Amino acid sequence: MANSSPVYDWFQERLEIQDIADDISTKYVPPHVNIFYCLGGITLVCFLIQFATGFAMTFYYKPTVAEAYSSVQYLMTDVSFGWLIRSVHRWSASMMVLMLILHVFRVYLTGGFKRPRELTWVTGVTMAVITVSFGVTGYSLPWDQVGYWAVKIVSGVPAAIPVVGDFMVELLRGGESVGQSTLTRFYSLHTFVMPWLLAVFMLMHFLMIRKQGISGPL
C-alpha cells in the first residue's frame, strides 16, 4: 500500500490486515440484494445499542426488591442524561424486536431458510427466542406494579405443563412465590446469561452467512 503510515505497517507486518480488508471489501454482493436485506444488520445495531445503554445502567441499578424501583427513579431524575440512556434502551429494544420480525419475514419470503442454509435459519430462530426472552426479563427489572405482575404471570405459565410444570415455576421464581430470588434470577439472565448466549449464536449466524453467502432470488 502506497504512502502507508508506520502504524499501518506495524499491524500489517504482524497481522496482514490488508488481506482481511481486501476479503471484506471484495465480497461478492448479488444484484438482487436490496434495502430489505439490511434488516438483519439493523437488528445487530440495535443489539449493540442495547448492550451499551444496558451496561451504563448497571452502574446505578440495584437488583433488590427494596431498591430496584428507587434506583430506576434515581437514574431517571438525578443522573446526568440517565433519562436519555434508559429511554434509548427502551426504544431500541422495541426497534430490535420489530427489525427482527421483519428480518424473519424477509428471509422466509425469499426462501433464505432452504438448503444449504438450514442451520443459519435455526440459529436465527434461536436468537429470536432469546430476544423475546430479553424483553420478558427486562420488563421486570424496575420492579414496579407492571413488572411485578408481569413476572408473576409469565413465571406461572409453565405450571400448565404436566409433570414438570411446578418444578419449572419454582426454578424460575427461585421459590414458591415471586420475590427477591425471582428478581435476582431475572437480572442475571437479562444482564449476563442471555447476552452471552445471543453473542455466541450471533457469531455462528454471521460465520455461516459469510461462508455460504447471501441466498439467491426465488
UniProtKB/Swiss-Prot annotation:
One of its GO terms (cellular component) is plasma membrane-derived thylakoid membrane. Heme c binds at residue 38. InterPro entries: Cyt_b/b6_N, Cyt_B6_PetB, Cytb/b6-like_sf, Cytochrome_b_N_euk/bac, Di-haem_cyt_TM. Heme b 2 binds at residues 89, 190. It comes from the Bacteria. Gene3D superfamilies: Cytochrome Bc1 Complex, Chain C. One of its GO terms (molecular function) is oxidoreductase activity. It is a multi-pass membrane protein. Signal peptide: none annotated. The chain crosses the membrane at residues 35-55, 93-113, 119-139, 189-209. It is found in: Cellular thylakoid membrane. Binds 2 heme b groups non-covalently with two histidine residues as axial ligands. Keywords: Electron transport, Heme, Iron, Membrane, Metal-binding, Photosynthesis, Thylakoid, Transmembrane, Transmembrane helix, Transport. The 4 large subunits of the cytochrome b6-f complex are cytochrome b6, subunit IV (17 kDa polypeptide, PetD), cytochrome f and the Rieske protein, while the 4 small subunits are PetG, PetL, PetM and PetN. The complex functions as a dimer. Component of the cytochrome b6-f complex, which mediates electron transfer between photosystem II (PSII) and photosystem I (PSI), cyclic electron flow around PSI, and state transitions. Belongs to the cytochrome b family. PetB subfamily. Heme 1 (or BH or b566) is high-potential and absorbs at about 566 nm, and heme 2 (or BL or b562) is low-potential and absorbs at about 562 nm. This is Cytochrome b6. It comes from Parasynechococcus marenigrum (strain WH8102).
